[in-house]
Amino acid sequence: MILLVRFAPAADAELLAVIARIGADSPSAAVAFRDKALHALSRLRDFPDSGRTLPEYPALPVREVIAAPYRFFYQVKVDAVWIVAVWQGAQLADPPEDWVSRKR
């Protein structure tokens, strides 16, 4: 089954902020990163479980895809794969309590 890959509003805002930060220094690098990220995420349409479980929080029902240096956290739902958060790879923090419940 082919699933849609969708962004929760918070994750969409996080991605747009990343692209804006990169674009402030180099617009072409921002476009290249956006394309790299979307390409990495596109595999989830056909292989939604292909991302790895989070090494820091293996009990969470969340997986990740890496588009270096960013980590895209997602959940597989019946209707779609939902990107729920975007973190810079060096970020170490407690998991947001709302990851599992972020609404589309």
Which residues does each predicted region cover?
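Enriched for short, Lys/Arg-rich terminal
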Residues: 67-71, 75-104
